[in-house]
Amino acid sequence: MASTFSATSSMGSSLAPPSNRLSSFVSISSSSFGRTQSIAQRKARFPKIYAAKQLHFNKDGTAIKKLQAGVNKLADLVGVTLGPKGRNVVLESKYGSPRIVNDGVTVAREVELEDPVENIGAKLVRQAASKTNDLAGDGTTTSVVLAQGLIAEGVKVVAAGANPVLITRGIEKTTKALVAELKKMSKEVEDSELADVAAVSAGNNYEVGNMIAEAMAKVGRKGVVTLEEGKSAENSLYVVEGMQFDRGYISPYFVTDSEKMCAEYENCKLFLVDKKITNARDIISILEDAIKGGYPLLIIAEDIEQEPLATLVVNKLRGTIKVAALKAPGFGERKSQYLDDIAALTGATVIREEVGLQLEKVGPEVLGNAGKVVLTKDTTTIVGDGSTEEVVKKRVEQIKNLIEAAEQDYEKEKLNERIAKLSGGVAVIQVGAQTETELKEKKLRVEDALNATKAAVEEGIVVGGGCTLLRLASKVDAIKETLANDEEKVGADIVKKALSYPLKLIAKNAGVNGSVVSEKVLSSDNPKHGYNAATGKYEDLMAAGIIDPTKVVRCCLEHASSVAKTFLMSDCVVVEIKEPESAAPAGNPMDNSGYGF
């Protein structure tokens, strides 16, 4: 016997053909199917598979050597891209043309080594690149090279009998102290220096640097700058109305681009609700209108419960409706204010019961219009269609009045953020190239440059070209005096030696001896003096525009140190034993007789 409870709502039957009908997917089923099966039968159908493991101990140093071999293979591969004279890496693509990239983290993600222990070593260092990329958006190659240096120097002293626990503690304390020194060396970035920061990150490409600086000048430092693939061979820049906030899609099933993991719609309608949506029936009429009109729909509400969310997801996956949903940004009163800002930008009406609007009774007249919406896991960008310019101006004036009346600095800061999001608009850089392969490589460079510029705005800038890390090495001796244990001091020395690795590799990629370059740089007491690998000159790097964002250098140092500590504390590696590939069955595969002759 079987019993089934279902709550199913069918909508749009008179508005769309059967294949486009919208259905609410809410059902609970219980069945006696399978109850008669014995436990033995189930075990036979679903056998457990136990994979044997291989243990690699470090008694003779072989485990660490193999891990380090994996680290070196990845770092040597990624390292060729470092600096203004770094080379490209060609990545095989299963589908389409090969990819030619100069981006460290993109190269690192492609590396899978045949030896499982070496592969674990490569994966450890890849974490430094990925974490730096997530937080700073640039400096991934430097993170890998710095981690390689810390591991190389650390393995030497651990092999000589030093205590890895105390060594790693010394590395940790030294890194923390160096980050504090780095912040002292940092200075706030001027508008005229933004182009230099972007250009250095893009491989000394001042066309890209100037374009990013121009974009920030147009939308402000707190404005939003996005990248698109252009249709011509030239780069271009344009600015449109729009706002971005830190709220992504509620469910990954709303994604329309599985490669970028984002939901993107053009000429989209917006439905703004200042309450929780608890019942699918409340939004039936709005969804039916979207099916009938054939337009994408973005729902922004305080929250969406399981039943209405399941309705949206199922019908989106069936192709019945183009829809996405997210929770409204902010909390409490600020949430309502953000919804009003979005309404001003899009011309929507916010659904609130206190003003007499009931969710189940509203029609398409309350929907707003957006030229484009892009939702990722963490952010949403809404670009207006340009029809609400006057309303936006009035809204900005209202917020400015609130700033004058505000007493707390925190409140003023939040109000200024709202103005930037409303009036700053979205600057769109279209990256152009002659071929698709060149376009992808170029877009990665521009993306790095944009991320570096944003990082510079956040935490300031320092001298670039690997010279800041080299200068930090001179601070280590003073830091050692604060460490009580001798082996912790050895950990500090490991950091000191590793800090020269990035500059030496930049010089090597430029065809110069890295050790000679390091000595010449340190021979000058001027902290801004360094080696310009692009020109081969020793000069004032700050004046020459060779600048790095402080945030990028900090993330490189912290994440490389974290990975090195994990590596040096490892003493055993456990990997799966690869099963031999089973031989092909005997007999003619085209023979249907049932006999294997």
Swiss-Prot record:
<dbReference type="GO" id="GO:0042026">
    <property type="term" value="P:protein refolding"/>
</dbReference>
<comment type="similarity">
    <text>Belongs to the chaperonin (HSP60) family.</text>
</comment>
<feature type="modified residue" description="Phosphoserine">
    <location>
        <position position="97"/>
    </location>
</feature>
<dbReference type="Pfam" id="PF00118">
    <property type="entry name" value="Cpn60_TCP1"/>
</dbReference>
<dbReference type="InterPro" id="IPR002423">
    <property type="entry name" value="Cpn60/GroEL/TCP-1"/>
</dbReference>
<dbReference type="GO" id="GO:0005524">
    <property type="term" value="F:ATP binding"/>
</dbReference>
<dbReference type="InterPro" id="IPR027409">
    <property type="entry name" value="GroEL-like_apical_dom_sf"/>
</dbReference>
<keyword id="KW-0934">Plastid</keyword>
<keyword id="KW-0597">Phosphoprotein</keyword>
<keyword id="KW-0175">Coiled coil</keyword>
<keyword id="KW-0067">ATP-binding</keyword>
<feature type="modified residue" description="Phosphoserine">
    <location>
        <position position="474"/>
    </location>
</feature>
<comment type="function">
    <text>Involved in protein assisted folding.</text>
</comment>
<dbReference type="GO" id="GO:0005739">
    <property type="term" value="C:mitochondrion"/>
</dbReference>
<keyword id="KW-0150">Chloroplast</keyword>
<dbReference type="GO" id="GO:0140662">
    <property type="term" value="F:ATP-dependent protein folding chaperone"/>
</dbReference>
<dbReference type="GO" id="GO:0009570">
    <property type="term" value="C:chloroplast stroma"/>
</dbReference>
<feature type="region of interest" description="Disordered">
    <location>
        <begin position="1"/>
        <end position="20"/>
    </location>
</feature>
<dbReference type="InterPro" id="IPR027410">
    <property type="entry name" value="TCP-1-like_intermed_sf"/>
</dbReference>
<dbReference type="GO" id="GO:0009507">
    <property type="term" value="C:chloroplast"/>
</dbReference>
<dbReference type="InterPro" id="IPR027413">
    <property type="entry name" value="GROEL-like_equatorial_sf"/>
</dbReference>
<feature type="transit peptide" description="Chloroplast">
    <location>
        <begin position="1"/>
        <end position="29"/>
    </location>
</feature>
<feature type="coiled-coil region">
    <location>
        <begin position="387"/>
        <end position="489"/>
    </location>
</feature>
<dbReference type="InterPro" id="IPR018370">
    <property type="entry name" value="Chaperonin_Cpn60_CS"/>
</dbReference>
<comment type="subunit">
    <text>Part of the Cpn60 complex composed of 7 alpha and 7 beta subunits. Can also form a complex composed of 14 beta subunits only. Both complexes show ATPase activity. The Cpn60 complex interacts with the Cpn10 complex.</text>
</comment>
<keyword id="KW-0547">Nucleotide-binding</keyword>
<protein>
    <recommendedName>
        <fullName>Chaperonin 60 subunit beta 3, chloroplastic</fullName>
    </recommendedName>
</protein>
<keyword id="KW-0143">Chaperone</keyword>
<dbReference type="InterPro" id="IPR001844">
    <property type="entry name" value="Cpn60/GroEL"/>
</dbReference>
<keyword id="KW-0809">Transit peptide</keyword>
<dbReference type="GO" id="GO:0009536">
    <property type="term" value="C:plastid"/>
</dbReference>
